[in-house]
């Protein structure tokens, strides 16, 4: 079996890559990964060097896996700073490291694409052997698989990788017919408070959901602007995604994108106030980014959670992943679920820790 290292996802055709993963999960689509690279969001300069893997058998591609060589731990949402600090304290280099993940995207999904009829255990054995060899070649301390589906951790990898468990809060669709049907499952006081929040959040404000081609260029420009403002306010940076990403993502994955938006309530259309960006597939909705140009009470909950729940019910989606963290989501019908990561540490003293 031959391994090929792709310095860019575009060294593999979109038809081949997407056929190996055979899923409508949006974040592993060739177009999404390609745009991260071509927009300058993911590149050497941002500390995400593409090293994607393609496995071939007798010249026929049979498996693929996203892989990055990284010199930091930002944009991962699985925190390993304590490991990095421990390495530093012992005078050992932790970076670079190898990461199999979707950059900036803590969303559970497939991480290895395998052609039909190929034994997954065989692919995992070959990948693990090659990862160890590549880590030595590139001086990488470790390999990290972030937010894989649970099955991946119970096969070959369970013998060589450490598993870590985290918690997110997801909403599950129990065949609700509409939002009222959903809130009817709440205790009376809880339901009353939530509906009061919704009314308060839309006083003098129009809230809408836009899908695909309904999202105009000016809304993409606004989403980009408030995304950067949100990060600037939070940590003094402009965030991970560039303006070009927002300019082009609608053309790349438009049919799998929903934007919930808020405007001032005025005849002829008011000023844009806030927006939240979601992706979706046949099974779930994934809330990713939010931003606003002023503070409005409860508007974040309306655009990021309630609009997402309504959309999921309308589309008959099974679940809604509204993003990392947030125990406050429980009061809005979200439940805690386990999320996973797996880690191979080359240094024996640390791998046994």
PLM segments and residue spans:
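Extended, hydrophobic alpha-helical segments in both membrane/secreted and soluble proteins
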Residues: 223, 245, 272, 287, ...
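Short glycine/proline-enriched loop/turn "hinge" motifs that connect secondary-structure elements
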Residues: 94-106, 279
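Conserved acetyl-CoA-binding loop-helix of GNAT-fold acetyltransferases
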Residues: 94, 119-132, 295-310, 321
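Hydrophobic/aromatic ligand-binding patch that stacks against planar heteroaromatic rings
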Residues: 134, 311, 328
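A short, internal acetyl-CoA/4′-phosphopantetheine-binding micro-motif in the GNAT/acyltransferase core
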Residues: 107-120, 290-298
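A conserved beta-strand-loop-helix scaffold within acyl/acetyltransferase catalytic domains
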Residues: 1-93, 132-297
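Conserved GNAT acetyl-CoA-binding A-motif
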Residues: 138-147, 312-324
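Active-site/acyl-donor-binding loops of N-acyltransferases
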Residues: 10, 69, 109, 156-186, ...
């Amino acid at each position: 079996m031959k391994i090929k290292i792709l310095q860019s996802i575009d060294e593999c055709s979109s038809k081949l890559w997407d056929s190996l993963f055979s899923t409508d999960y949006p974040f592993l689509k060739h177009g999404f990964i390609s745009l991260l690279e071509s927009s300058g969001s993911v590149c050497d300069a941002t500390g995400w060097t593409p090293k994607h893997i393609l496995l071939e058998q007798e010249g026929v591609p049979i498996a693929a896996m996203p892989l990055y060589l990284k010199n930091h731990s930002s944009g991962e949402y699985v925190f390993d700073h304590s490991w990095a600090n421990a390495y530093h304290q012992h005078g050992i280099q932790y970076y670079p490291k190898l990461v199999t993940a979707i950059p900036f995207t803590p969303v559970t999904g497939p991480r290895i694409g395998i052609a039909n009829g190929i034994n997954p255990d065989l692919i995992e054995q070959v990948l693990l052997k090659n990862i160890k060899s590549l880590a030595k070649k590139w001086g990488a301390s470790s390999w990290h698989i972030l937010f894989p589906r649970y099955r991946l951790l119970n096969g070959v990898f369970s013998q060589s990788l450490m598993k870590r468990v985290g918690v997110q809060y997801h909403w599950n669709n129990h065949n609700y017919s509409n939002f009222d049907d959903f809130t009817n499952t709440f205790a009376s006081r809880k339901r009353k408070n939530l509906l009061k929040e919704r009314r308060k959040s839309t006083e003098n404000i129009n809230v809408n959901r836009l899908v695909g081609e309904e999202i105009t260029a000016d809304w993409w420009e606004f989403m980009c602007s408030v995304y950067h403002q949100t990060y600037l306010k939070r940590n003094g940076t402009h965030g991970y995604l560039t303006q070009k990403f927002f300019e082009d993502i609608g053309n790349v994955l438009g049919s799998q994108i929903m934007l919930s938006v808020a405007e001032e309530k005025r005849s002829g259309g008011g000023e844009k106030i806030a927006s939240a960006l979601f992706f979706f597939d046949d099974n779930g909705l994934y809330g990713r980014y939010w931003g606003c140009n002023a503070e409005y009470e409860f508007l974040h909950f309306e655009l990021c959670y309630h609009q997402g729940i309504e959309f999921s019910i309308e589309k008959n989606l099974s679940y809604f992943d509204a993003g990392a963290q947030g125990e406050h989501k429980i009061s809005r019908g979200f439940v805690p679920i386990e999320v996973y990561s797996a880690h191979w540490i080359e240094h024996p003293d640390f791998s046994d820790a």
